[in-house]
Amino acid sequence: MEDFVRQCFNPMIVELAEKAMKEYGEDPKIETNKFAAICTHLEVCFMYSDFHFINEQGESIIVELDDPNALLKHRFEIIEGRDRTMAWTVVNSICNTTGAEKPKFLPDLYDYKENRFIEIGVTRREVHIYYLEKANKIKSEKTHIHIFSFTGEEMATKADYTLDEESRARIKTRLFTIRQEMASRGLWDSFVSPKEAKKQLKKDLKSQGQCAGSPTKVSRRTSPALRILEPMWMDSNRTATLRASFLKCPKK
């Protein structure tokens, strides 16, 4: 699973996931399913934010190419992917600026158009079950919840899906691709079943250091959201090194 994660996800997402796990004393080499889940969640958060801006009239627009128009404002503030101290600093700043109620738990995004925090969920189970778990944990009507599954299902607070259908379809397609790639390597069952995960962990520990086959699809594109976050945690030389070493597994 660890090899799959490093091959399937953008190196910067992998780096952010490793930092997040180490912040909580977790080892990506051992808790590989959690490693995969965190990378998936990060990518969904960045895809959620990608290309969405607010123009001078306060309208939400989609711009897929880099636009020199400085009057455009990013619609979403990305909170996920930052260390806890920085994340709470961003949340406090948003609350002070917008008057939004401070959430009890760190959310993933802030939507400047709808003026609300957003909690993103990616589940391997039924979306309604995971939605209820999130809602019971957050216990706040102010935080909007949006859940995606690997089967293409989604659920959101008051059936308000925030994004246009095409943007959500991109996310669903990516999740389906990840599921298919895992399944083709015999990793999907262990990803969804704790019992199977233990078996897979034993296999992983025995075969550490060996490269798995390269996936048929790899997310090479750097998310615009990642380009915003990048200077906060990684210098350009380190980024170049990561990109140069991307997909370094030799073909068998």
Curated annotation (Swiss-Prot):
The protein's name in its UniProt record: Protein PA-X
> What are the coiled-coil residue ranges?
none
Task: List the InterPro entries.
Answer: PA/PA-X, PA/PA-X_sf
Q: In which family does this protein belong, per the annotation?
A: Belongs to the influenza viruses PA-X family.
GO biological process terms, semicolon-separated: viral RNA genome replication; viral translational frameshifting
The residues responsible for catalysis, as annotated, are E80, D108
What residues correspond to the site Important for efficient shutoff activity and nuclear localization? K195, K198, K199
Site label Important for efficient shutoff activity, positions: K202, K203, K206
User: What keywords is this UniProt entry annotated with?
Assistant: Decay of host mRNAs by virus, Eukaryotic host gene expression shutoff by virus, Host cytoplasm, Host gene expression shutoff by virus, Host mRNA suppression by virus, Host nucleus, Host-virus interaction
Its biological purpose = Plays a major role in the shutoff of the host protein expression by cleaving mRNAs probably via an endonuclease activity. This host shutoff allows the virus to escape from the host antiviral response. Hijacks host RNA splicing machinery to selectively target host RNAs containing introns for destruction. This may explain the preferential degradation of RNAs that have undergone co- or post-transcriptional processing.
- Compartments where located: Host cytoplasm; Host nucleus
Q: Any notes on this protein's domains?
A: The probable endonuclease active site in the N-terminus and the basic amino acid cluster in the C-terminus are important for the shutoff activity. The C-terminus acts as a nuclear localization signal. The C-terminus is recruited to host protein complexes involved in nuclear Pol II RNA processing.
- What molecular function does GO assign, one term? RNA binding
Source organism's superkingdom? Viruses
